[in-house]
């Protein structure tokens, strides 16, 4: 009986653990993640609505817009 009770308690606790993907809010058309700090493989793009950083992988970062030179 105690094993059954322990099993039920374990199921209840594990049922409340959030999945890893829902830990961060998504940004930049779903490609980035809102975090306090960006990892070394990511760059900061803009601020998320909650004032955290929108971190985007370097592989997904759009190329810079070329500046026009006036002669």
UniProtKB/Swiss-Prot annotation:
**Keyword Disulfide bond applies:** yes
Q: Mind telling me which residue stretches traverse the membrane in this protein?
A: none
Alphabetical GO biological process terms? defense response to bacterium; innate immune response
Q: Does the keyword Secreted apply?
A: yes
Q: Where is the signal peptide?
A: 1-22
Q: Mind listing the UniProt keywords for this protein, alphabetically?
A: Antibiotic, Antimicrobial, Defensin, Disulfide bond, Secreted, Signal
Question: Known InterPro entries for this protein?
Answer: Beta_defensin_dom
Q: Which GO terms describe its cellular component?
A: extracellular region
A matching Pfam family: Defensin_beta_2
Please state where this protein is localized.
Secreted
Disulfide-linked positions: 27-54, 34-48, 38-55
According to its UniProt entry, the function of this protein is described as: Has antibacterial activity.
Q: Which family does it belong to?
A: Belongs to the beta-defensin family.
Which protein are we looking at?
A: Beta-defensin 124
The beginning of the lineage is: Eukaryota, Metazoa, Chordata, Craniata, Vertebrata
């Amino acid at each position: 009986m105690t094993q059954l009770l322990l099993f039920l308690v374990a199921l209840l606790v594990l049922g409340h653990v959030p999945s890893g993907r829902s830990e961060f809010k998504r940004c930049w058309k779903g490609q980035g993640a809102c975090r306090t700090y960006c990892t070394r493989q990511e760059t900061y793009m803009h601020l998320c609505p909650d004032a955290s950083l929108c971190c985007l992988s370097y592989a997904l970062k759009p190329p810079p817009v070329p500046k026009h030179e006036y002669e």
